C-alpha cells in the first residue's frame, strides 16, 4: 500500500496523540489538526482520510458534523468521533449503562471492510460515558458488546465508519489491524 495522508481531527480527547502515533507507526503521513479547521483548509491538504478523535464532550466537537456531511473522503470516528457521525446523520446519543475506562469484549456482527479479519470477538479498550443509542437511518450495525449495543457502525453508501472503542491504545487487541483496514479503504477510494 502506498503512503497515505491521514489527518487526525483533535476533539480534545486524551488519546488524540496516540492516534497520531499509531497512524505514523503504520507508515502513513499524518498530522493533527484542530477541530475548527475550515473545510477548505482540510481539502487543500489533499488528505486520503480523516480520523475524528475522541473527546470529553460533544459541545467541543467543533466542525466535526460539517466534516462528516460535506467532505467526500473516508472518515473513521473514534469514541466521540463515532458519536458525532451518528448525530450528524440523525442518530441519537445518550449516557451509557456503564461509563469508565475498561477492557471489554466486542462481538463483530458484520465484518465489513473496517472489521475484516477481526472477529468474531475482539478484546478492546473503552473509555466513555456516552454512546450511540439509535443508529442513523440506513446505517449498518457492525459490532456490539454487553455494555454498549452500537460499538461500531458504517454509513450505508459512503466510506464513513465509527467505533466506540479506542483502536489506538496498546490494550486493544488488533487495533493496528482495524487502522490498516481503514487505510485500505482510503487507498481504494
Curated annotation (Swiss-Prot):
Alphabetized Pfam families for the sequence: GATase
UniProt-listed Enzyme Commission number(s): 6.3.5.2
InterPro entries in the cross-refs: Class_I_gatase-like (IPR029062), GATASE (IPR017926), GMP_synth_GATase (IPR004739), GMP_synthase_A (IPR023686)
Annotated active site: 79, 166, 168
Reaction equations catalysed: XMP + L-glutamine + ATP + H2O = GMP + L-glutamate + AMP + diphosphate + 2 H(+)
UniProt key word Ligase: yes
Example GO molecular function: ATP binding
UniProt KW keywords: ATP-binding, Glutamine amidotransferase, GMP biosynthesis, Ligase, Nucleotide-binding, Purine biosynthesis
CDD domains: GATase1_GMP_Synthase
Domain of life: Archaea
PANTHER family: GMP SYNTHASE [GLUTAMINE-HYDROLYZING], GMP SYNTHASE-RELATED
Database matches in NCBIfam families: guaA_Nterm, PRK00758.1
Subunit structure: Heterodimer composed of a glutamine amidotransferase subunit (A) and a GMP-binding subunit (B).
Function noted in UniProt: Catalyzes the synthesis of GMP from XMP.
Protein name (Swiss-Prot/TrEMBL): GMP synthase [glutamine-hydrolyzing] subunit A
The species this protein was found in: Methanosarcina acetivorans (strain ATCC 35395 / DSM 2834 / JCM 12185 / C2A)
Amino acid at each position: 500500500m502506498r503512503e497515505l495522508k491521514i489527518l487526525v481531527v483533535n476533539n480534545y480527547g486524551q488519546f488524540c496523540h496516540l492516534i497520531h502515533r499509531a497512524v505514523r507507526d503504520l507508515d502513513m503521513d499524518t498530522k493533527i489538526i484542530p477541530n475548527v479547521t475550515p473545510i477548505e483548509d482540510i481539502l487543500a491538504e489533499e488528505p486520503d482520510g480523516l480520523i475524528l478523535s475522541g473527546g470529553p464532550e460533544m459541545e467541543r466537537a467543533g466542525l466535526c458534523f460539517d466534516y462528516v456531511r460535506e467532505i467526500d473522503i473516508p472518515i473513521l470516528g473514534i469514541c466521540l468521533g463515532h458519536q458525532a457521525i451518528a448525530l450528524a446523520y440523525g442518530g441519537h446519543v445518550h449516557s451509557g449503562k456503564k461509563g469508565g475506562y475498561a477492557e471489554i469484549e466486542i462481538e463483530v456482527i458484520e465484518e465489513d471492510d473496517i472489521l475484516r479479519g477481526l472477529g468474531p470477538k475482539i478484546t478492546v479498550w473503552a473509555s466513555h460515558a456516552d454512546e450511540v443509542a439509535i443508529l442513523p437511518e440506513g446505517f449498518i450495525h457492525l459490532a456490539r458488546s454487553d455494555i454498549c449495543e452500537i460499538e461500531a457502525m458504517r454509513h450505508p453508501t459512503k466510506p464513513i465508519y465509527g467505533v466506540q472503542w479506542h483502536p489506538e491504545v496498546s490494550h486493544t487487541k488488533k487495533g493496528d489491524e482495524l487502522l490498516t483496514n481503514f487505510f485500505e479503504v482510503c487507498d481504494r477510494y
